[in-house]
Amino acid sequence: MEHYISLFVRAVFIENMALAFFLGMCTFIAISKKVETAIGLGIAVIVVQTITVPANNLIYTYLLKSGALAWAGLPEVDLSFLGLLSYIGVIAAIVQILEMTLDKYVPSLYNALGVFLPLITVNCAIMGGTLFMVERDYNLGESVVYGMGSGLSWALAIALLAGIREKLKYSDVPDGLQGLGITFITIGLMSLGFMSFSGVQL
């Protein structure tokens, strides 16, 4: 249990998808203008990550990995070259289901997210979670914990940035830094703050 807790804490704070690896920056900057919308997208990313990382773990373990098809009498077959294609297919399917669900049950959030909801499919933070899982050879339990933690890390970062940007509207920002300029500086300062967790040994 201790191992899973440390993996979760490491995924959220020490290896933050947005502020340590700078993944998913396009959506991160574009949707962080309002806290409400940012939290909505953050929850969507958590859901997608929590489902896709374990799902891709099963596909990799039982179909793609070298020797994975031993159960089918094909121990020599290595389909790992199909990895990226398979992972993108799973991510696209999950995002499509999420999109249809939001359209039916939470149309206000669906409209607020606009084009950025289907763009979760190509959000490199989502793909990054799966690729880190494969690289680190996580088992199914670790994949579930890591998927949830990495999704939460991105959601936490975008919610924090949205809160700061809402406050910045009422600040006296120099003309040359208004808009994206001050946003990039803010992200840099947030990243420095999260760097303080890098010395924590779990």
From Swiss-Prot:
Query: Which GO BP terms, alphabetically?
Result: respiratory electron transport chain; sodium ion transport
Membrane association type:
Multi-pass membrane protein
Question: Can you provide one Gene Ontology molecular function annotated for this UniProt record?
Answer: oxidoreductase activity, acting on NAD(P)H, quinone or similar compound as acceptor
Record's catalysed reaction(s):
a ubiquinone + n Na(+)(in) + NADH + H(+) = a ubiquinol + n Na(+)(out) + NAD(+)
Q: What does this protein do?
A: NQR complex catalyzes the reduction of ubiquinone-1 to ubiquinol by two successive reactions, coupled with the transport of Na(+) ions from the cytoplasm to the periplasm. NqrA to NqrE are probably involved in the second step, the conversion of ubisemiquinone to ubiquinol.
Say which family it is in.
Answer: Belongs to the NqrDE/RnfAE family.
Please identify the protein, giving its name as recorded. Na(+)-translocating NADH-quinone reductase subunit E
Q: Which organism is it from?
A: Stutzerimonas stutzeri (strain A1501) (Pseudomonas stutzeri)
Q: What is the lineage of its organism?
A: Bacteria, Pseudomonadati, Pseudomonadota, Gammaproteobacteria, Pseudomonadales
